């Protein structure tokens, strides 16, 4: 949390609400108005004094209006209305002086800079940019450590240590945090692109989806490696300063600042691994969807490709390569009776000749009745809990077969909403012999 947010949080909410109401703050930016504001920001950055005249604002409005033909012509009247709207919303400030012979000059307000900065300057989050920011932080931390080792008066600590930590290091940490949030949005954008591709034509979209997934995965891994390497160094620097001020009550404000920096550093470094874990889950979800689509449509797609290949053979000749390998032997006999090594003695005549399939059907029916109670009562099915309770009632030698039947019956009952959100479930132990299951709670029937 930035210092500005901390200061705001210290004020009662009703006072802040009254302040907003008293000053009549409001924002209403249509797409055209936002484009106009961004155009003003771009032009301002090209000026040394970052000031624009009214004529330059009219020129910017004309450029924007060309791309928004449906809104009307770029008349001076409409341009003045747009400028006045931005002034009223405190997005640009208007000044008039004798030096400009009565003509107005305009500057972006801090609010406008924040808005345009988000859209213009924070759209690219690369490894190079992150490396530069982390190098700057390390340099500022080195200055603070050097000043702390020298020691001195309270004024020395406030000026050369506290100020560097709070305003230099803290601000760069906030900037990195903001860039990471932009990267989160970019991931959402990539997910939307993949969804659009799969909805249009998943057969043609497979290669594009794979490219988008791999590119994002590689970017996240590079960023995480950079964060991990720099994070260890920054952690050491924070601990060095903490050791120098430990136990000194007069320097307690330094310890509080270091505590805040430690929280920011932990959040920044943990972001990378969390982003990778979430993306891996989404990657698996997409591949599972594609495999399912291929299984459902494999005959049509393969036959279509084969016919097309034969048709185009003379224009684009091809070679057919095939492999003829021996089939693998299935060592599991489907006619085996469920094992029960814990039972000794003579098998009753009525079950002596029962085959596995018959036993399986009876078990499936009983398990289905057990799970149907969840469906009738509208309760979710947590397979981890259900399996653990059910398997505890049976010998360990039956656990594998029984767990498979329970899961098979459960997925027929319904599905989990979390599967469609690419949420990766945790592994849960289901018996005392190390068996685990990974499944989301079934909450839709």
UniProtKB/Swiss-Prot annotation:
GO MF terms held by the record: calcium ion binding
- Residue ranges for the region (Leucine-zipper) are 213-241
Taxonomically, which superkingdom? Bacteria
Tell me the gene name: mukF
Gene Ontology terms: cellular component = cytoplasm; nucleoid
The protein in question is named Chromosome partition protein MukF
Which cysteines in this chain are paired by disulphide bridges?
Answer: none
**Quick check: keyword Cell cycle in the entry?**
yes
Keywords in alphabetical order, please. Answer: Calcium, Cell cycle, Cell division, Chromosome partition, Cytoplasm, DNA condensation
Subunit (UniProt): Interacts, and probably forms a ternary complex, with MukE and MukB via its C-terminal region. The complex formation is stimulated by calcium or magnesium. It is required for an interaction between MukE and MukB.
Compartment(s) of residence: Cytoplasm, Nucleoid
Q: What biological-process GO terms show up in the record?
A: cell division; chromosome condensation; chromosome segregation; DNA replication
Describe the task this protein carries out: Involved in chromosome condensation, segregation and cell cycle progression. May participate in facilitating chromosome segregation by condensation DNA from both sides of a centrally located replisome during cell division. Not required for mini-F plasmid partitioning. Probably acts via its interaction with MukB and MukE. Overexpression results in anucleate cells. It has a calcium binding activity.
| Coarse class of the protein's main subcellular location | cytoplasm
What the record says about family reads: Belongs to the MukF family.
Any one Pfam family here would be: KicB
**Could you tell me which InterPro entries the record lists for this protein?**
Chromosome_partition_MukF (IPR005582), MukF_C (IPR033441), MukF_C_sf (IPR038198), MukF_M (IPR033440), MukF_M_sp (IPR036141), MukF_WHTH (IPR033439), WH-like_DNA-bd_sf (IPR036388), WH_DNA-bd_sf (IPR036390)
